[in-house]
UniProtKB/Swiss-Prot annotation:
Keywords: Endonuclease, Hydrolase, Magnesium, Nuclease, Restriction system. It comes from Bacillus subtilis. It is an enzyme of class 3 (hydrolase). Its EC number is 3.1.21.4. Its cofactor is Mg(2+). It catalyses: Endonucleolytic cleavage of DNA to give specific double-stranded fragments with terminal 5'-phosphates. GO terms for molecular function: DNA binding; type II site-specific deoxyribonuclease activity. InterPro entries: Restrct_endonuc-II-like, Restrct_endonuc_II_MspI. Homodimer. This is Type II restriction enzyme BsuFI.
Length: 395
């Protein structure tokens, strides 16, 4: 076997190992209730089991629904053979719902373009395919987690997905495979496969590091963050220290893992907000905020305190930046709690803090209330006692 074929075979082997590691990690570490079979094969009655896929994932909590996975490094190679297998499998095995072709997230930009193009083709209206989609390994992981957690109660589901998002970011930053790909992508990508390199690269580029130029010596990420002074949870979810050949960087990351368009970002006494905005108790804006807390909604405020509504409409927007800083950085007692980067995991995006504040004000001030980029209300059963402020996600 010549060297090129050896590299090609090793590359395919590593891609398959990567998928195996990911799905088994979901079962054994995250506790997702799935069964995994490697080397799926099936055939017509009394004939050879000639139609094959690399993995079967069975969802125990969903009537044993089955997904099949074909791992590859190249969409072009053998894709029509995979389509042929998928066509026959669907005729034979009624339990199979989805069939995915899966590629490592670390494939070249040219291969990623082919992946996206074939995905569009599959999901279009002018092409018949027996595949469900073409995914990266990380996209597959997300789909499995979302499917397996559908029947979990909403609050618990949010906690599970939130904790998983934090752990995933820590793991991908600490992953030595990502470090190797960053330092020498052209050589490393031939045999090293990663499910998270694309995310890793976006995070590092957001803090002004350059792939292949800023050589990574060591990365240490943790989600062990000290509590706030009131024992509450800080906005920082992950802190990472990066040592390169020329410098050392520390960045603190807030992870937003939600499918909702708005999320609660603050509940508490309006006095905390007044204090943070450095307003006196007799300031008309303070009195207007107190009136809002008492009635709990803009509609009631207009009815009972129309002048206070006018004051909020005219003045609260002048404090938009201070509001964002208060809502994202309350009660700090340790510099590790100050957020530098914000990561959205559902509709993936990475922002540095200052750019995000500017973007948030410009994008959402017209969608909130009182000229602010927030929705203002009260917590359930706490009307007249506390305020609740909802912020916009990027969904």
């Amino acid at each position: 076997m010549n060297k090129d074929n050896q590299i090609k075979n090793e590359s395919g082997k590593q891609a398959k190992i990567l998928v195996s590691e990911i799905v088994n990690n979901l079962k054994n570490e995250l506790g997702i209730n799935i069964e995994i079979e490697e080397g799926y094969s099936i055939g017509y009655p009394n004939q050879e089991k000639q139609f094959k896929m690399d993995f079967l994932v069975q969802f125990t909590d969903f009537d044993n629904e089955q997904w099949l996975i074909k791992s590859t490094n190249s969409i072009r190679e053998r894709i029509y053979g995979t389509e042929f297998f998928a066509q026959n499998i669907r005729l034979i095995d009624e339990k199979v719902k989805n069939i995915y072709v899966v590629v490592p997230d670390s494939i070249s930009s040219a291969e990623m373009k082919k992946k996206r193009n074939y995905s569009v083709k599959i999901n279009g209206t002018t092409y018949t395919s027996f595949l469900t989609d073409v995914l990266t390994v990380n996209e597959l992981r997300q789909k499995i987690v979302e499917k397996a957690s559908q029947n979990i109660a909403q609050g618990l589901r949010a906690n599970v997905l939130g904790n998983d998002a934090e752990t995933s970011i820590v793991n991908l930053l600490n992953d030595l495979k990502n470090k190797a790909l960053w330092n020498d992508y052209q050589n490393a990508q031939q045999t090293i496969k990663s499910s998270t390199y694309k995310i890793y690269k976006e995070i590092l580029e957001k803090i002004d590091l350059k792939e292949g130029f800023d050589k990574i010596l060591e990365v240490t990420a943790t989600n062990d963050i000290p509590l706030l002074s009131n024992r509450g949870k800080p906005k920082t979810d992950v802190s990472v220290t990066i040592k390169t050949n020329t410098k050392e960087l520390i960045r603190n990351i807030s992870i937003k893992n939600t499918r909702e368009k708005t999320v609660t970002i603050h509940e508490g006494s309006v006095s905390d907000l007044i204090s943070r905005l450095k307003l006196s108790e007799t300031d008309p804006l303070s009195q207007a905020l107190i009136h809002f807390e008492k009635v709990g909604s803009k509609k009631k405020l207009i009815a009972e305190h129309p002048n206070s509504d006018k004051i909020l409409e005219e003045n609260l927007k002048l404090y938009n930046r201070e509001l964002i800083e208060f809502l994202h950085s309350p009660l700090l007692n340790d510099k590790i709690q100050m957020v530098d980067l914000i990561i959205f995991t559902n509709k993936f995006a990475v922002w540095n803090r200052d750019d995000y504040i500017k973007h948030y004000i410009e994008e959402y001030s017209g969608k909130g209330q009182f000229g602010t980029p927030f929705k203002w209300t009260y917590p359930s059963k706490k009307r007249g006692q506390k305020i609740q402020i909802k912020g916009f996600s990027n969904n």
